[in-house]
């Protein structure tokens, strides 16, 4: 073979190999790509492509979290709670009578909403109360706000007056006796049967100031649920008449029972009805004669009238405010933080468990005298707005 022929044969062989190579590669590429994908899936354990990003060896591997999901749930809950707040306002303004189950459903919904104190809401509401009523100066009768010679009108029997003579004037403190005002943490303890087995006693007793209503029991087994500390307790004059025989033959029993309240203030509505005056004064003189540690105070009738007008504008139109709402209103003015316990005007819990009216008995109030569900809807609004906090169920025990 000629030298030129050998060179041509070599070139022809190379061209043939190149042609075969080109024909073979396109047919194999899809198969190879499938292998790479399967290998990639194994390496990433099925992670979606959207979460697989190119990165240098120094870049940290990103972690898939549920923070977005949690944020969405939080926004949904916030929106739900806002709607619930508006719903309660509308609910309380309705003239239609709502059933106990309606209220319990609302309370169930409220319990799913996280509570947070709202300083601005609290300040605004407190300012409105101070403007209309001014508990700091006018909550109780004092020598400063009721001088000798005043003709004081009764709260309910407003056409009747009592002249303030020296013998009455000397029963009054010189000024408001709440020297440590404003108190940081206050507990207003109602008497609802919801307190039974609540284990709230320790938490209540840690408060700076504890308000109670109508001489409730605080010793023995109940103390673990209701606490034992008392700074101020109201007394309904009917208790003095019915339970203590108007402090005649049962004076000793009265003095024995009140010893459990330490140096608390006893608050009586001496100037609400004329029938209350003599009984309230009898309590004052009994404590003076026995040199008891407690001091007697009297609700100022004008304060109570102004307070009733304030709540009337919000739909509470009953014959008279309950003691619980009166004291709650006082606490908002005297305290920075207010928590309510034992406020439960219903016959059962949200779990449908029967509840006694009081934690110590099941005696119901006079029909129509107070407007408990209407008042309670107002308190629910204060809770939802972060002005005060309602304890609905058992307390957390450390």
UniProtKB/Swiss-Prot annotation:
Alpha-2,8-sialyltransferase that prefers O-glycans to N-glycans or glycolipids as acceptor substrates. The minimal acceptor substrate is the NeuAc-alpha-2,3(6)-Gal sequence at the non-reducing end of their carbohydrate groups. GO terms for biological process: blastocyst hatching; carbohydrate biosynthetic process; ganglioside biosynthetic process; glycolipid biosynthetic process; glycoprotein metabolic process; N-glycan processing; oligosaccharide metabolic process; protein glycosylation. Substrate binds at residues 214, 236-238, 322-324. Its EC number is 2.4.99.-. Residues 25-398 are lumenal. It catalyses: a ganglioside GM3 + CMP-N-acetyl-beta-neuraminate = a ganglioside GD3 + CMP + H(+); a ganglioside GM3 (d18:1(4E)) + CMP-N-acetyl-beta-neuraminate = a ganglioside GD3 (d18:1(4E)) + CMP + H(+); a ganglioside GD1a (d18:1(4E)) + CMP-N-acetyl-beta-neuraminate = a ganglioside GT1a (d18:1(4E)) + CMP + H(+); a ganglioside GD1a + CMP-N-acetyl-beta-neuraminate = a ganglioside GT1a + CMP + H(+). It is an enzyme of class 2 (transferase). One of its GO terms (molecular function) is sialyltransferase activity. Keywords: Disulfide bond, Glycoprotein, Glycosyltransferase, Golgi apparatus, Lipid metabolism, Membrane, Signal-anchor, Transferase, Transmembrane, Transmembrane helix. The keyword Glycosyltransferase applies. Belongs to the glycosyltransferase 29 family. Glycans are attached at residues 66, 93, 151, 196. The active site is at residue 370. Pathway: Protein modification; protein glycosylation. It is found in: Golgi apparatus membrane. It comes from the Eukaryota. One of its GO terms (cellular component) is Golgi membrane. This is Alpha-2,8-sialyltransferase 8F. The chain crosses the membrane at residues 4-24.
């Amino acid at each position: 073979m000629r030298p030129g022929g050998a060179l041509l044969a070599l070139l022809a062989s190379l061209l043939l190999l190149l042609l075969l190579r080109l024909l073979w590669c396109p047919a194999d590429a899809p198969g190879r790509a499938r292998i790479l994908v399967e290998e990639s899936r194994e390496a990433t354990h099925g992670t979606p492509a959207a979460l697989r990003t190119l990165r240098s060896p120094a870049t940290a591997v990103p972690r898939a979290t549920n923070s977005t999901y949690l944020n969405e749930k939080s926004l949904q809950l916030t929106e739900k709670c806002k709607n619930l707040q508006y719903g309660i306002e509308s609910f309380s303004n309705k003239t239609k009578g709502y059933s106990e189950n309606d209220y319990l459903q609302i309370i169930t919904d409220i319990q799913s909403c996280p509570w947070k104190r709202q300083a601005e809401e609290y300040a605004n509401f407190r300012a409105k109360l101070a403007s209309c009523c001014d508990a700091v100066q006018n909550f109780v009768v004092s020598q400063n706000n009721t001088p000798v010679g005043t003709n004081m009108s009764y709260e309910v029997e407003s056409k009747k007056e009592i002249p303030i003579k020296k013998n009455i004037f000397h029963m009054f403190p010189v000024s408001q006796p709440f020297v440590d005002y404003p108190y940081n943490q206050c507990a207003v303890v109602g008497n609802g049967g919801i307190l039974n087995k609540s284990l709230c006693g320790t938490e209540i007793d840690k408060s700076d100031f504890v308000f109670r209503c109508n001489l409730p029991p605080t010793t023995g087994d109940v103390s673990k649920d209701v606490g034992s500390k008392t700074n101020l307790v109201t007394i309904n004059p009917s208790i003095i008449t019915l339970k203590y025989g108007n402090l005649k033959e049962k004076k000793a029993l009265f003095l024995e029972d009140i010893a459990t309240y330490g140096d608390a203030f006893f608050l009586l509505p001496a100037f609400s009805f004329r029938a209350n005056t003599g009984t309230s004064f009898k309590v004052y003189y009994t404590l003076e004669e026995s040199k008891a540690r407690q001091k007697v105070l009297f609700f100022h009738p004008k304060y109570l009238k102004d307070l009733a007008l304030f709540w009337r504008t919000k739909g509470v139109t009953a014959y008279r405010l309950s003691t619980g709402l009166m004291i709650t209103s006082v606490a908002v003015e005297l305290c920075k933080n207010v928590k309510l316990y034992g406020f439960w005007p219903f016959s059962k819990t949200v779990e449908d468990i029967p509840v006694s009216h009081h934690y110590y008995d099941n005696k119901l109030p006079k029909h129509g005298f107070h407007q408990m569900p209407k008042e309670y809807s107002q308190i629910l609004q204060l809770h939802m707005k972060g002005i005060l906090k309602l304890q609905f169920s058992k307390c957390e025990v450390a």
